[in-house]
Amino acid sequence: MGSMKEIFNSLFLKELLKGMSVTGKYFFARKITVQYPEEKTPQSFRFRGLHALRRYPNGEERCIACKLCEAICPALAITIEAEPRDDGSRRTTRYDIDLTKCIFCGFCEEACPVDAVVETRIFEYHGEKRGDLYYTKQMLLANGDRYEDQIAKDRELDASYR
């Protein structure tokens, strides 16, 4: 037999009333759920999304084929091949990122000495096949050309944190 207090609590369903009070408190509280995709929350300028390769203002690719991004990538998602130029510097012939492997850690962006590879704010992309998420050098350069204004603005805002 339980004590009189246990009988009283079970008779008046004290636990149930406590639970209902918590539910009632949150039922009438202000809603914080965002109805995506109709509503969108603001993104940080430091958001790490889809990759892009940048160019200098004269149109030349920034990548100097140092392969630091390939070496630092923990997921081994970056593949780079390079060949020497006539002036002795190197040029990338292949720069591929496999987004099915990428964990979007941002190490490639931090390792790049010339800010050639960056991660944009783009997070809405898809692929119907596995190969659609394999980005080649041309696709990455196209992303960089398309979003260069936003990338430059984000890099300027991020400069104080670097």
Swiss-Prot record:
Cofactor: record remark: Binds 2 [4Fe-4S] clusters per subunit.
GO biological process terms, semicolon-separated: aerobic respiration
Catalytic activity: a quinone + NADH + 5 H(+)(in) = a quinol + NAD(+) + 4 H(+)(out)
Entry binding sites for [4Fe-4S] cluster 1: 63, 66, 69, 112
Enzyme superclass (EC): translocase
Membrane topology label: Peripheral membrane protein
Ranges in coiled-coil conformation: none
Family classification: Belongs to the complex I 23 kDa subunit family.
Protein name: NADH-quinone oxidoreductase subunit I
Source organism (scientific name): Dechloromonas aromatica (strain RCB)
